[in-house]
Structures are given as structure tokens and as C-alpha cells.
Amino acid sequence: MIKMPRGTQDILPQDSAKWRYIENRLHTLMELYNYKEIRTPIFESTELFARGVGDSTDVVQKEMYTFKDKGDRSLTLRPEGTAAVVRSYIEHKMQGEPNQPIKLYYNGPMFRYERKQKGRYRQFNQFGVEAIGAENPSIDAEILAMVMHIYESFGLKHLKLVINSIGDSESRKEYNEALVKHFEPVIDTFCSDCQSRLHTNPMRILDCKIDRDKEAVKNAPRITDYLNNDSKSYYEQVKLHLDNLNISYVEDPNLVRGLDYYTHTAFELMIDNPEYDGAITTLCGGGRYNGLLQLLDGPDETGIGFALSIERLLMALDEEGISLDVSEDFDLFVVTMGEDADRYAVKLINDLRRNGIKVDKDYLNRKIKGQMKQADRLNAKYTVVIGDQELENNEIGVKNMISGESENVQLDELVNYFKSRKEV
């Protein structure tokens, strides 16, 4: 038997309704904030992620699904969404549009070759938001407010917003030099990844899952001590907006995020529930990226965004015992007796569906009792039984499955009968 690839999942019908519910809620919330949907290819040029995400990141070095096409071009299944959205922004010259900043959101599968664990898949679904074309603390605050709005709208509690500033390029240069000086004497005691990052991306040592509890990490210089005046001012204004919005947050000077393009504001939304086992601690993450557009040969413009995992959102809802109202009303089940009735029912249900009525029938030649059980399984509001007598009399009994009451209706009026009930 051929099975699904390791690190993937089948979303079965009983679960796909939850996915649709979440995605519809997210689409609705985006309309409130005036964000428009963008759809980019599932695969892109490998160079896009090597340059945009960063050569020294785990994503580029270890996790990308890269292949050569028949034209010997190197392509990669997208591991994240921001680089592709920025590429599209540049390619289609959106910077020339009058409605700046350009507010975009996306939703779709991403691919990373990660070790299988709870809450992580090699194909995972990511919903993300990007606001490009404005460097203003208020748009950072809007993004953070949106993150809280999304998760609170599902009824989640135990949320902890963690923020930091990693400054501009000047601040980061000074900070990286301080980190190299701090870690160099003890780097031999760190993992091989940290050793390779020391001179390429020393900030990532602070984020290492293996060594982050070491004393050298706990005592490392703090980015906030190296922020220049502009970076400090920007960060303080973001926090003032959050205070004004009554959004609680925790500052973590070691929060650096895993991708190279972040500047200034960086953040994660965590689940802060002591009953969790820690496997799905981070629900969402993002930040500002002021140099990414130029890095990809675009204009000197800035952006900010975030991404969340639908899988982790579903797990968090399950952990907190929050059920989604995904019950689906089904209008009518047609029970048939005999070939003539079945032939009539095929045309009838086609007419009903063309008029917006959710309707189904039996296709396995079940007896009446079996067909009625199928109607119950579908939670059909109504059933009708069509046999030779009903066809001869041009009249049918419509049974309300909730009240148990029945009403006789002319067969040729059945479509109008159900249309009138849908419109109420």
C-alpha cells in the first residue's frame, strides 16, 4: 500500500470543514483591515530564497526542497511566503500604485524538510500578512493588533505577545561585533551550527534550540543596549501604540527570529498555558524587514508582516477545548422506490441544486429504512419519499425531520416550496 510521504497529512472531510471555517474567518478579518489577497507560485527560483531568506539560515542550508527542472533551472518549493510576496511586489511594480502602503495577505502550503514532531509538518499551511511601503510605528502596531484580533476572535486565551527590536543595519552591525567578541572564547562548547554562525549570523546563536540555556547565552550582550537613537525612538513609539491599544506584551532581548531579513520590530505570539507540553509554544511570528526589497533588486521601501500556521492554530484550539461551529445544514434527502421514481429523482435533485437547495439521494439501492438512516446521518432537515403512487398523483409528502410533521406538496411545486424556505 502506498502511503502519504513522511511529514505530510491528509485533511479528511470531517476536518476540512474546520479548515474552511478558519480560512473564512481570516478572509473576513482581512477585509476589516483593508488587506487584499495575493497568490504566488508554489515554487520559485532558488535564488529568491537564498538571497531573500539568507544563505546562513537553517531554512536555506537544511530545509528547502530544491530541484532542477528540464531546463536545468534551480527551483525550490516555497519554504515561507514573504520573499515570494516581495518578489511579486517588485516584479509587478506595485510601488507605483497610489494606495500605499500595499496591504496583502496570502494563504497556502509551504514546504520545509524538518524533523517530524508535534505541530510541525514538511508540508504545512501558512497564512501570512505583508504591509509594504510604509515605515511607521503605527503600521507595526496595526500588525500586532491584527495578530491579537485573529487569535482572540477564536476564543483563545493564555496568549503572550513577545516583542523586541533588532534595530537598523547600523545597530545590528555593532551588536553582531559585540556578540562575536562575547562568544569567541567559549564557542568550542557550542553546537556545530552555532560555531558556523559565529561569523556569519551571530544573533542566531541566541535562538539556538540546543544551546540557548547556556550561561554564555543568558549573559550575552543585549540588542537594546546597542540600538542607536533612531532605532530606540522607533521601538518606543511602537510600544506607546501598544499601550494605547491596551495590548499586553513581554519584551525579550533574545528574540531575533530565524530569518535574516528582519529589522527593527520582531515579535512572536506564544501560548502561555502551564498545561501545555511546550510542543506548540509559538503560534505566530513576524517582524519588520527594511532591507529586503533592495536585497531583491527592488526599490528602497520597507515592509512588515507575520505568518501563522493553520495546523498550530487548530492544535491550540483543541488544547483549550474550543470547538468550531462547523455543523452543516442539509436541506433535503430524496428517498426513492423503484426505477421510475429513481429516474424522476435524478432530474428533481438536479433542478433543486440549480436553485440553491442542498439535496442528495441514495445510489446503492438501499431499502427505505436504510435510506432514512442515510438522511439522519446527513442531518437532513427534510425528507421526501417518491414511489409509483406519488408519481401517479403528482403529490408528495414532505417530512420535517426536526418536528416530525409532514406536509403534502405538488411534485411540480417542490422546487418553489424549498426555494421559499431558503429565502426566509
Swiss-Prot record:
InterPro entries, sorted: aa-tRNA-synth_II, aa-tRNA-synth_II/BPL/LPL, Anticodon-bd, Anticodon-bd_dom_sf, His-tRNA-ligase, HisRS-like_core, HisRS/HisZ, HisRS_anticodon
Enzyme class label: ligase
Key words, A-Z: Aminoacyl-tRNA synthetase, ATP-binding, Cytoplasm, Ligase, Nucleotide-binding, Protein biosynthesis
Subcellular location as annotated: Cytoplasm
GO MF assignments: ATP binding; catalytic activity, acting on a protein; histidine-tRNA ligase activity; transferase activity
Entry's EC annotation: 6.1.1.21
Record-level GO BP terms: histidyl-tRNA aminoacylation
GO (cellular component) term, any one: cytoplasm
Keyword Nucleotide-binding: yes
CDD domains: HisRS-like_core (cd00773), HisRS_anticodon (cd00859)
Catalytic activity: tRNA(His) + L-histidine + ATP = L-histidyl-tRNA(His) + AMP + diphosphate + H(+)
PROSITE patterns: AA_TRNA_LIGASE_II
SUPFAM superfamilies: Class II aaRS ABD-related, Class II aaRS and biotin synthetases
Pfam families reported in the protein's UniProt record: HGTP_anticodon, tRNA-synt_His
PANTHER family attached to this UniProt entry: HISTIDINE--TRNA LIGASE, MITOCHONDRIAL-RELATED, HISTIDYL-TRNA SYNTHETASE
NCBIfam families named in the record: hisS (TIGR00442)
Entry similarity comment: Belongs to the class-II aminoacyl-tRNA synthetase family.
Subunit (UniProt): Homodimer.
HAMAP family (UniProt xref): His_tRNA_synth
The name this protein goes by in its record: Histidine--tRNA ligase
Source organism (scientific name): Staphylococcus epidermidis (strain ATCC 35984 / DSM 28319 / BCRC 17069 / CCUG 31568 / BM 3577 / RP62A)
Gene name of the record: hisS
